[in-house]
Amino acid sequence: MVPLVWHERPMEQMRDDGRRFLEDLRGRRTTRHFSTRPVPRDLIETAILAGGTAPSGAHLQPWTFVAISNAELKQRLRDAAEAEERRTYEERMPEAWREVLAPLGTDAIKTHLTDAPWVVVLFRQNKRLRGNGEWGPTYYATESCGIAAGMFIAAVHRMGLVTLTHTPSPMGFLQTLLERPGHETAMLVLPVGYPAEDAKVPDLARKALEDVSVFFE
């Protein structure tokens, strides 16, 4: 153990910092319309490192961020994703899921996977290699990776870029295409870049505090 480094802030600064952060995040929107404008690799590295500051079960950090800018590989990824998505939209999608997707205008065409300059695929590590060469389990890997994804998304927004949480279903093809080991499972596909000049977003509202919280005082 080492000492915690922590500096108390005046209450008004805490409130101001919290409000500014909230207002910044309220401006975050998910778009499927990306510019092809390049994004330097170091910005993606910074976002990944920010995601990696997330707490994790037993501090095992059970995530792998695979970042892709290679145009040929992005095209192969898009082709495979669209093939799966077409089957989902045409054959596998439950009516209840189709109902909630309708206002978002989604379909099987995934231009964001080739337009965005970067595609980051987040893999969950289901087990870990011990120092003695034997495999052991990870713990709370799904929850840990979910938190890491949220912090990655916040970092992308804070830098002035946009991203999209894409979950092609099923996602097994990503493990093969990206040559990941058998103990890793794809969780999220996150295109990252600048929004297109004509980018659109759904006209949606976020739930109010009273709809998402309960306080006991």
Q: Predicted segments — roles?
A:
Residues 174-187:
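Short, electropositive alpha-helical surface patch
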Residues 2-17, 30-31, 185-217:
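C-terminal helix-cap and adjacent tail motif
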Residues 1-115, 217:
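N-terminal amphipathic, basic helical "cap/leader" segment at the start of enzyme domains
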Residues 71, 124-126, 196:
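Short, flexible active-site-adjacent loop segments at beta-strand->alpha-helix junctions, enriched
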Residues 116-118, 159, 186-188:
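Generic beta-strand structural signal
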Residues 47-51, 120, 126-177:
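Small-aliphatic-rich amphipathic alpha-helix that forms the alpha element of a beta-alpha
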Residues 66-68, 120-123:
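Short, conserved beta-strand edge motifs with alternating hydrophobic and charged residues
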